[in-house]
Amino acid sequence: EVLNKILTLAAQQGIGEEPVEATEPEEDEALAALDQGDYATAEAAYKRLIARKPNDSYAKLGLAQVQLLARTHGLDAAKIMEDAIKSPDDIDLQIQCADVEVMSGYLEPAFDRLLRLLVLFDGDEQKRIKDRLLELFALVDPADPRVMKARTQLANALF
């Protein structure tokens, strides 16, 4: 009973409440669009926010998340993963599979998949694989050991 009174008093004083963070209008627009499943509008809103505030890490993360959602929306993850096993050198399929894996929380397999593919190709194909890896890295905390390891492997593969 005493604990409940303390918690009630604390709440009345605003203690323990989450601070309300101000959001940018573009972010509000993006989130509203996402609620409607409108990935194109959400992506455009985040791009406008990044154009206005180029160092906004939350906007960059939001954009990367929206782009991943758009790429994986409606995909049959199990079929893509099956097909990726059957066609290990199909760049489109492997990139799509990596997206599905990241979306499912399987970061290391996704990174390993693209890193393996990276050394098999050069030129435009290699650039495409590298660019997707960098996009996927942007979805994860840069201090995450899985990202740090994959970034090192990427650098070693390219140089």
Where in the sequence are the language-model features?
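Alpha-solenoid helical repeat scaffolds
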Residues: 47, 81-85, 115, 134, ...
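Canonical tetratricopeptide repeat
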Residues: 60, 94, 128-129, 147
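Non-catalytic, surface beta->alpha helical segment in thiol-disulfide oxidoreductase systems
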Residues: 1-15
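Short coil turns that delineate tetratricopeptide repeat
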Residues: 54, 87-89, 105, 122-124, ...
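Alpha-helical linker/edge segments of TPR/alpha-solenoid repeat scaffolds
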Residues: 65-81, 135-159
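Alpha-helical segment of the N-proximal tetratricopeptide repeat
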Residues: 21-52, 79, 83-104
